Amino acid sequence: MTREELKHRVDEAIERHADEIVAVGEAIRRHPELGFKELRTSALVETKFRQLGLAPRTGLAITGVRADAVGGAGPGPTFALVGELDALVVAGHPEADRSTGAVHACGHNAQIAGLVGAAIGLVRARAMDRLAGRVVFIAVPAEEGGDLEWRLNEVRAGRLEFLGGKCELLRLGHLDDVDLAMMIHTTPRPEDGLACVPGSNNGRFGKTARFVGRAAHAGGAPHMGVNALYAAHLALAAINALRETFRDEDTIRVHPILT
């Protein structure tokens, strides 16, 4: 069987299960969950992997799921397909969860549907029998940067070290055997179609600063006070002054959150 014939068999298997794959994405869209709290979503992914005869490992970096499909053509590289479990916080969105503000406005529901769809295609078409190495399907938690105060509390309690799910998976060794990883992402750019394969991905870290003021009578004794808001404004202005030094090709992004 040629490579193109094998790809065609996988495509046909995906088409046969298209309704099931779409249903996965829709189920996740209806029940958005925030990072490291994607219990329902990860349980759905686990169920789908088990239905394919895979043996997923769960609870990785709290809610991550990994299932390995071993090729029948001998040893080879380990290739990871990645999907992200979590939703954004957009409280004003019409589909936002009323209690958490979570909504899949970044399309991670479609990502996970694609991850499950790829697993369905490779397994149902018996493509792994003809491939060497392994294909690893990984559903990762907490790609988005919201809910930071909760995550920082988890760090202080020793349950997390990093604020993002991929960083935690790396720290815990769950990606040590992976030679190559890729993912798709929905895109707002018409020239990319409905989804794209990113050429690169930014790393991310978070910093927290606390500005402490001192209360004073605004009319009678303003000189006795310290305005914490002014201090925060100065800090943001200093950060903004750095932006012109960022090189476009480095795709540096700075997103302050003031609470």
Question: What spans do the regions from the language model cover?
Answer:
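N-proximal short alpha-helices
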Residues: M1, I14-A18, V22, P198-T208
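Acidic/His- and Gly-rich active-site-bordering loop/insert found
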Residues: R3-A105, N109-V136, P141-A142
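Intrinsic structural disorder
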Residues: M1, L6, A27-I28, D179, ...
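Histidine/acidic-residue-rich, glycine-tolerant segments that coordinate divalent metal ions
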Residues: V90-V103, N109-A110, L122, D129-I257
